[in-house]
Amino acid sequence: MQSILILRVTFKRQFFSDTSRSKSSAGMISTWQSAYKPYLNRLIGVSHKSTLKLNEELLVKILLSYKENTRSRQQCGIALSALARHIKLELPKNWKQLQSGYGIHESNFRKLPSDEEIINSFQLIPNPKWRFVFGLMATYGLRNHEVFFSDLSCLKKGGDKILRVFPNTKTGEHQVWPFHPEWVGLFELENISDTLDLLPVIKTDLKETTLQHIGRRVSEQFRRYKISFTPYDLRHAWAVRTILIGLPNTVAAKMMGHSVSIHTKTYHHWITRRDQQIAVDSALSRVKY
């Protein structure tokens, strides 16, 4: 038990020394808190209750304790494989199969809100500041916390409406275009001035809070206003929107602040369908009836 606790300390030190993981310290803290710490805590808890040593068998036991085809299962696999590399422990050859890939499959996509549902839900929010948050997330596909760490000056009259997300966010600085562009007006995002306090007052000093905690505040407000979908559903819906209009995957991934590989894996179903539709349309255009 003691050795695993010590190992977590050394692994954490190594994690934060690897600057390639994130472009910002706040992003690294958020990633550690949400994507590594919970799984290491479970490892420590299970090892404490059992006689298993830190070996392949124990890591497999932890991985299989999460439901198959879930984000938790996938992230647990990523965290434990990083730990295994740290201590030079060989994992079973079928680890990736056990980890079970996570993506938004067709069944999950059916649960995403339609444009009409998004517009109707906007009207349910009585507080204009939280309504503004909702509109930004729907129009720009932002992560929960990114709303509070973005340059909104682009929304002023005459601005280009291209939002810049600040470097101190989870995946660093990136620019985002609105999809749909007309939602900037529909959600009243351009009614801003230098003196207008647009966003809800929450603690955003990252010396006193975390990106994860800020994100939770947004989720809490969605539940409070009885929005029938989650904040991340708005982000996924934005991604699907860009796919269906034909925006290149590389461009959409950059706007979302993640890698192309994550983008294509997460949205595989819709990307495949788009590419097939393009091929079918091209073939049909050459057929003479």
Question: Which ranges hold each PLM region?
Answer:
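Short, aromatic/basic-rich helix-turn unit that serves as a nucleic-acid recognition element
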Residues: 7-39
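N-terminal DNA-binding recognition helix of tyrosine site-specific recombinases/integrases
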Residues: 35-46, 56-57, 61-99, 143-145
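Basic, Lys/Arg- and aromatic-enriched nucleic-acid-binding interface segment
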Residues: 70-74, 98-144, 148
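Active-site-proximal segment of tyrosine recombinases
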Residues: 146-147, 229-230, 239, 246-258
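Conserved tyrosine-mediated DNA breakage-rejoining catalytic core shared by Y-recombinases
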Residues: 149-187
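Short, polar N-cap/turn motifs at the start of nucleic acid-interacting alpha helices
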Residues: 155-159, 247-266
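Catalytic-site neighborhood detector that most strongly recognizes the C-terminal catalytic loop/helix
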Residues: 168-171, 256-281
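Active-site/catalytic core of tyrosine-dependent DNA strand-transfer enzymes
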Residues: 179-228, 232-233, 238
